[in-house]
Design a protein with these regions (language model features):
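Generic N-terminal amphipathic, Lys/Arg-enriched alpha-helix
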Residues: 1-25, 196
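A short, well-structured juxtamembrane/interface segment
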Residues: 25-43, 204-216
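Alpha-helical segments flanking ligand/cofactor-binding loops in enzyme cores
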Residues: 38, 64, 129-133, 242, ...
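Anion (oxyanion) recognition and catalysis
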Residues: 41-42, 136, 154, 217, ...
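Glycine/serine-rich anion-binding loops at beta->alpha junctions
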Residues: 45-63, 228-243
């Protein structure tokens, strides 16, 4: 059991590093795609989604959030997962071939200005390429949620969201994060709901910490606070931080400046400079 737990912990850390490596380009692609979805819905258009296997579940997940709700009660918006109807997909697959299961539906349901969202881990599925060609023929916009360069599908899309290449499971986990972020952008644009929930990790300024605290309070998040010099980090510090983190939903740790530590502890302190103390604290799992 312990060996298995260690392996799982390693996997979780690898996933965290993968998420941390996502840069500003991915963020910009998500923002642009979210605005495209919002514009389509605002113009009374419809969003169609398609994908295979695990990506099919992403399609239905996105549609459930759009038609139902993501964060707040609101009227439903128009979206259809082309993967959802087993009778339809098997009928088309039987009569026209599996390569046409999505394209046939795109031509039937899509109109100029509508949007088709194609989820794929490889970018090379023939039925998704055919769906893109069908969308082009009826003057729909095409958004690909892909990995790496997007494969062959990447060349057929008007917009791309490109997560890092990796295992199928890792890509699908990234796609899940992406679809939730897309829903945030859509609701923010169409309903004026602030992007959130607020997620902060690492070193922030006092003003940023105050803004986070206000945002968390509005969301009903309980926040703990502790502070200190943390010049020579020891077991007592770790126990205090662990206790503080366990007492609330989030923890903010205040850190004395170098000049403050010097006034409190003498000219020979701090031993560890402020920036390094901050990074050390931020690396702890309890903070």
């Amino acid at each position: 059991m312990e060996d298995m737990a260690l392996v799982i912990e390693g996997r979780l850390r690898a996933r965290a590093r993968r998420s941390a490596a996502a840069g500003s380009l991915l963020a910009m692609e998500v923002a642009q795609a979210g605005l495209l979805i919002a514009t389509t819905l605002a113009d009374a258009g419809i969003v169609l989604t398609a994908g295979n296997g695990g990506s099919a579940t992403q399609c239905e997940h996105l549609v459930s959030e759009v038609v139902g709700r993501f964060r707040s009660d609101r009227p439903g918006m128009r979206a259809i997962a082309l993967t959802a109807g087993s009778a339809t997909t098997t009928a088309i697959g039987n009569d026209y071939g599996f390569d046409q299961v999505f394209s046939h539906q795109v031509r039937a349901l899509g109109r100029p200005g509508d949007l088709v969202v194609l989820f794929t881990t490889s970018g090379n599925s023939v039925n998704l390429l055919e769906a893109a060609h069908a969308a082009r023929s009826v003057e729909m916009n095409i958004l690909g949620i892909v990995a790496g360069d997007g494969g062959r599908l990447g060349q057929e899309c008007d917009n791309l969201i490109r997560v890092g290449a990796g295992s199928t499971a890792a890509i699908q986990e990234d796609h899940l994060t992406v679809l939730h972020l897309l829903c945030e952008v859509v609701e923010s644009e169409l309903l004026g709901i602030a992007l959130g929930p607020i997620e902060v990790d690492g070193v922030v300024t006092i003003d940023e910490a105050i803004d986070c605290r206000r945002g968390w309070a509005a969301q009903g998040v309980q926040v703990a606070w502790t502070n200190g010099c943390f010049d020579l980090l020891h077991q007592g510090h770790l126990a205090t931080l662990k206790y503080a983190r366990g007492s609330a939903d989030a923890l903010i740790v205040g850190l004395n400046t170098d000049s403050s530590v010097r006034r409190l502890k003498g000219d020979g302190r701090p031993i560890v400079p402020e920036a390094e103390r901050a990074e050390l604290l931020a690396s702890l799992s309890s903070v």
